Amino acid sequence: MAAKIRRDDEVIVLTGKDKGKRGKVKNVLSSGKAIVEGINLIKKHQKPVPAMNQPGGIVEKEAAIDLSNLAIFNAAASKADRVGFKIEDGKKVRVFKSNGETIK
């Protein structure tokens, strides 16, 4: 099945502690999850690695969030939208369900 949410898409969080926040997708994992910039931040306790000159401490980083909790953001309508597919010039393209506009 084709991916409805891809890397570099702007998405909005539908549920959870970050509900309503927007961010750019950094990575989509094969487990049906995505990592979004600035969303679902966790604190990781990291040990120092002297060989790589890396200090230890508490590091904030993005955790994966399930794709079902994300919706693609339609900038033209300024709201969350669903994704559909359409064949254009023999190629399958993603479109917004609300207005039929092609997603870049």
Curated annotation (Swiss-Prot):
Alphabetical UniProt keywords: Ribonucleoprotein, Ribosomal protein, RNA-binding, rRNA-binding
Coiled coil stretches, renumbered: none
SUPFAM superfamilies, alphabetized: Translation proteins SH3-like domain
Any one GO cellular component localisation term in the record: ribosome
Highest taxon in the source lineage: Bacteria
PROSITE patterns, per the entry: RIBOSOMAL_L24
MF terms (GO), sorted A to Z: rRNA binding; structural constituent of ribosome
One GO term of the biological process aspect: translation
Family matches, as Pfam families: KOW (PF00467), ribosomal_L24 (PF17136)
SMART domains for the chain: KOW (SM00739)
Similarity annotation: Belongs to the universal ribosomal protein uL24 family.
NCBIfam families documented for this protein: rplX_bact
The protein's role, per its UniProt record: One of two assembly initiator proteins, it binds directly to the 5'-end of the 23S rRNA, where it nucleates assembly of the 50S subunit. One of the proteins that surrounds the polypeptide exit tunnel on the outside of the subunit.
Subunit structure and binding partners: Part of the 50S ribosomal subunit.
Protein name: Large ribosomal subunit protein uL24
Gene source species: Sodalis glossinidius (strain morsitans)
Gene: rplX
